[in-house]
From Swiss-Prot:
Pathway: Lipid metabolism; fatty acid biosynthesis. The lineage of its organism: Bacteria, Pseudomonadati, Campylobacterota, Epsilonproteobacteria, Campylobacterales. The active site is at C114, H246, N276. It comes from Campylobacter jejuni subsp. jejuni serotype O:2 (strain ATCC 700819 / NCTC 11168). The keyword Glycosyltransferase does not apply. HAMAP family: FabH. Homodimer. GO terms for molecular function: 3-oxoacyl-[acyl-carrier-protein] synthase activity; beta-ketoacyl-acyl-carrier-protein synthase III activity. This is Beta-ketoacyl-[acyl-carrier-protein] synthase III. Belongs to the thiolase-like superfamily. FabH family.
Length: 324
């Protein structure tokens, strides 16, 4: 039966590395403290002349090629980001469409913070299985450095830049089995990008987070969510080939891994080298596993994410891309 399948995965990783040692020179922190609390050792930072759309475009071109398609085969572009090129418009998706030479196609952004890629999978699955679209390009892209206060040691240590992309199309096998998304806006003030309005045309954005509260809710929510999606689909955790979570904090990842009783071999962890890249983190981690030969065609994959909003989600899929 023809159903939605993730036919490719790719990423773009900026060259510049911002290490914990570098941050020690910028704010009152230490490599030991950052590593112990987060598991992060370094993160990537885009250059000044790279916008979020540029990062997304580079990942998109690789994803399209790996799906054995051309840009003109794409009939919808969906982007998840909390760091768009422009504050209101045009959308980052429209900028990427322009970069790819595409017009007269659907292109829009969604705002679901770190859960963004899960939300994209759900939307792309619905679009292709309804027959409205054939090949949907989904992109998580972030230049979080553009909204980061590098004087705030509580948050600047966490985030990095990057992009990941994939193509969702119909296929007879290796389907996106299930996607679950949810939200609770009552906790919105615990993790937000605050707007400080200097004038009607001049605004400064900065990310703010109450980390301890976010940590507790994230662990409980994600642990319950992954258990529920597995039970709903009559799948045992031990049947999962790879668990690829949002890369926010090593302690959160390990807590959910322990809940599922999964071995380290089945858990993909990249937070140590990229930090939290928000909506880009899952596809970036997937691409690392793909290029390392760990993610193969037909593998059963469990994804999960939690982000500002609060938003969260999980997905079960059999990877439909050709082996690297």
């Amino acid at each position: 039966m023809l159903k939605a399948s993730l036919k490719s995965i790719a990423s773009y990783i900026p060259e510049k590395i911002l290490s914990n040692a570098d941050l020690e020179k910028m704010v009152d922190t230490t490599d030991e403290w950052i590593t112990r609390r987060t598991g992060i050792k370094e993160r990537r930072i885009a250059s000044e002349n790279e916008n979020t759309s540029d990062l997304g475009t580079k990942a998109a071109l690789k994803a399209i090629e790996r799906a054995n398609l051309k840009p003109e085969d794409i009939d919808a572009i969906l982007v998840a980001t909390l760091s768009p090129d422009y504050f209101t418009m045009p959308s980052t998706a429209c900028k990427i469409a322009s970069n790819l030479g595409l017009v007269n196609i659907s292109a829009f952004d969604i705002s679901a913070a770190c859960s963004g890629f899960i939300y994209l999978l759900e939307q792309a699955k619905a679009l292709v299985e309804s027959g409205l679209k054939k090949n949907v390009l989904i992109i998580g892209a972030e230049k979080t450095s553009s909204i980061m206060d590098y004087n705030d040691r509580s948050i600047c240590i966490l985030f990095g830049d990057g992009a990941g992309a994939g193509v969702v199309s119909l296929d007879n096998e290796n389907h996106i089995l299930d996607v679950h998304t949810a939200s609770n806006g009552n906790y919105g003030d615990l993790l937000m990008t605050q707007r400080s309005q200097k004038s009607s045309l001049c605004q400064t954005l900065s990310m703010q987070m109450k980390g301890n509260e976010v940590f507790k809710i994230a662990v409980n929510t994600l642990s319950n969510d992954v258990v529920e999606i597995l039970a709903k689909n009559n799948i045992l955790a031990q049947e999962i080939d790879l668990f690829i979570p949002h890369q926010a904090n090593l302690r959160i990842i390990k807590a959910v891994q322990e809940k599922l009783n999964l071995s380290d071999e089945k858990c993909v962890i990249t937070v140590q080298k990229y930090g939290n890249t928000s909506a880009a983190s899952i596809p970036m981690a997937m691409n690392d596993a793909y290029e390392e030969g760990r993610l193969k065609k037909g593998n059963l994959i469990l994804l999960d994410a939690f982000g500002g909003g609060f938003t969260w989600g999980s997905a079960l899929l059999k990877f439909g891309g050709e082996n690297f």
